[in-house]
Curated annotation (Swiss-Prot):
Species whose genome carries this gene: Arabidopsis thaliana
Quaternary state and interactors: Part of a SCF (ASK-cullin-F-box) protein ligase complex. Interacts with ASK4.
The protein's name in its UniProt record: F-box protein At3g62230
Keyword Cell wall biogenesis/degradation set for record: no
Biological process, per Gene Ontology: pollen sperm cell differentiation; protein ubiquitination
């Protein structure tokens, strides 16, 4: 069949079917169909998925004045487009526009349009590329665009993503159908009031937000499967989590207390990263051990150097009071002596471990941190762990440099890993051949270590 015949067949379809077809295209592709004919020009204005992304529509000039007029023309185009929309329900609406505070009237019109069409999936990104920390956005909060009154009356939402605007969580009247929420660069006071009205919530992702008012997530939200906090600040002292079906939990930021009233016994992944901390906090040991104990069932567990260092302040710095179910353990590390107790603690607490990954990260000095062990003798102790005897098959080192402490840890694992099949060493990115010479030599040394397993293969990538 030639292309002309295909076009003829498509032209025989009803407008209803053609709208369904273009609604499965990207918005940019849907707009391109308007060039086919007058009929298509009208049909493309009925697509059910609308996406206005400034990076796809405009190539901005270097001059700030020229950029302003380009953005003004873009907002006028978007408003004109929705004013000429001839369709019915809108399934999804996306708006990505930086420096939007000068165009609040136009942005408000676009939001009200989406609300009027009973949008199910709403994504508003009004953030600035230059923002790096919460404070960057918080200082500009009075100038951020405020969501219109009509927004708080919407009842059709299934997905809500809001970046860089003023939003009052407690005022959203009927979010009972919402399954996914993602907030970034927003003050989130009284978030608990919103979550208490979302019984179908499955995913909650919060990044770079401040004044988060979240005292608890209760069993009312027992469908919640994924919970992520990244570089946020909380107004509460702690948050209680009753999340019996949680699959993924990730936290990045300063030490914060989560009390788990319940957690899934079949978790997929847990991630704990306190690298924003710069001071050694002895009292954080209890928080860390409580978190680890609550996440015992996680099949994949990732922790940062700060956690490895603070483990020695746990009530029992040898092992958790119950075994972890972890199969893959990812340790972000500098291989410093003050992390050794934490590394051994995690090995000792993971009797079913199959893959151990070390990811080298840049050093971040922790004030008042003093190693409590002799680094020269620590890995020479004749102490093995259950996982080394029965389950550990693979060890990975990402950004392998071949430092003294790296080699000591690897020598220990190879000497006692009875089931070990692979040790994969990945070279650092961006080094030239001269810089790689000593690293290759160190990798060769690893291949010569005395191995307990007869099937071990050491590979340098």
């Amino acid at each position: 069949m030639d292309s002309g015949s295909a076009v003829d067949i498509i032209s025989t379809l009803s407008d209803f079917l053609l709208v369904l077809i273009i609604s499965n295209l990207s918005f940019k592709e849907a707009l391109s169909t308007s060039r086919l004919s007058t009929r298509w020009r009208h049909i493309c204005r009925e697509t059910r998925n609308i996406s206005f992304r400034e990076d796809e529509i405009v190539t901005f000039a270097d001059d700030s004045v020229a950029r302003y007029y380009q953005r003004a023309a873009l907002v006028a185009y978007m408003v004109g487009w929705v004013n000429n929309f001839t369709g019915g329900v809108v399934e999804s609406f996306e708006l990505r526009l930086s420096n939007s505070y000068a165009f609040e009237e136009g942005v408000t019109t676009l939001i009200e349009f989406a609300v009027s069409k009973n949008v199910k999936h709403l994504f508003l990104d009004l953030s600035e590329p230059r923002w790096v920390t919460n404070n960057d956005a918080a200082q500009l909060e009075p100038g951020l665009i405020k969501l219109p009154e009509s927004f708080y009356k919407i009842t059709s939402l299934v997905t809500l993503k809001l970046f860089g605007c003023r939003f009052e969580p407690s005022r959203l009247a009927k979010p009972g159908m919402v399954k996914t929420m993602f907030f970034r660069w927003i003050r989130l006071e009284m978030l608990s009031a919103l979550i208490a009205k979302t019984p179908l919530l499955e995913i909650l992702n919060i990044k770079n937000c401040w004044e988060i008012g979240l005292d608890a997530i209760t069993g009312y939200n027992d469908r919640l499967m994924k919970l992520v906090f990244k570089y946020c600040s909380f107004s509460a002292q702690q948050t209680t989590l009753d999340v019996p079906n949680i699959q993924i939990f990730k936290y990045f930021g300063k030490v914060y207390r989560f009390e788990f009233a319940s957690a899934n016994k079949l978790m997929e992944e847990a991630y704990l990263d306190y690298r924003e901390e710069s001071r050694y906090n002895v009292s954080a040991g209890a928080i860390i051990s409580g978190f680890l104990y609550s996440m015992l069932s996680a099949k994949t567990f990732t922790i940062c150097p700060y956690v490895l260092q603070l483990i020695q302040e746990c009530e029992d710095p040898v092992r958790l009071k119950a075994p972890m179910e972890t199969r893959q353990l990812v340790l972000k590390t500098n291989f410093e002596p003050n992390e050794f107790v934490g590394i051994r603690f995690m090995l000792n607490s993971s009797p079913y471990l199959e893959t151990l990954s070390f990811q080298m990260v840049g050093p971040r000095p922790i004030e008042e941190m003093v190693p409590q062990i002799d680094p020269e003798a620590y890995w020479g102790q004749n102490t093995s762990h259950e996982c080394l005897k029965k389950t550990l098959k693979k060890v990975e080192v990402w950004s392998f440099y071949g430092g003294t402490h790296e080699l000591r840890v690897l020598e220990y694992l190879i000497r006692y890993g009875r089931m070990l099949e692979r040790v994969d060493l990945y070279q650092p990115i961006g080094l030239d051949d001269i810089q790689l010479l000593p690293i290759r030599a160190a990798a060769d040394r690893v291949g010569e270590f005395e191995a307990r397993s007869e099937n071990l293969v050491v590979t340098f990538y």
